């Protein structure tokens, strides 16, 4: 209702800052301070593993989370924009944080599992360049809008 709509902005801001503070030890935070409803990490802090933002995004799929916007803004080489919604429960947000910590740990102990993700999806990692140059939308098993 009318009273609850006033909480949309503050809740989105609270959620974003909570996630940022919880993950800043594992992920590089290029801009310090309070954020609004979104913030950007610049990949993992430990760059020695060779695990990229794309790898982290694909690994999130294995854990049932939609990958965030990646490689935007172009200001940062390994940008990962985290933009939690205002209506996520604390349990859901804590689950996301736990998975992000786990992926950071996997990157240190078994980087190949992160680099090879996703493992649990029907379609594995897509060759983005080939898909852009030679799309085969007719191969899709879902015949919507074709």
What positions do the PLM features span?
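Non-catalytic terminal extensions of PLP-dependent enzymes
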Residues: 2-146
């Amino acid at each position: 209702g009318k009273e609850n709509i006033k909480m949309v902005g503050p809740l989105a801001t609270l959620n974003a800052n909570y996630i940022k503070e919880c993950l800043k030890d594992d992920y590089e935070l290029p801009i310090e301070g309070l954020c609004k409803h979104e913030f950007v990490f610049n990949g993992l802090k430990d760059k020695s593993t060779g695990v990229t933002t794309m790898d982290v995004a694909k690994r999130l799929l294995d854990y049932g989370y939609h990958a965030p916007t990646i490689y935007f803004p172009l200001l940062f080489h390994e940008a990962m924009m985290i933009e939690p919604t205002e209506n996520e429960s604390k349990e859901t947000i804590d689950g996301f944080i736990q998975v992000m910590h786990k992926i950071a740990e996997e990157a240190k102990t078994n980087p190949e599992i992160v680099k090879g993700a996703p493992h649990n999806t029907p379609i594995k990692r897509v060759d983005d360049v080939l898909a852009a140059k030679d799309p085969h939308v007719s191969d899709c098993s879902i015949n919507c809008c074709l």
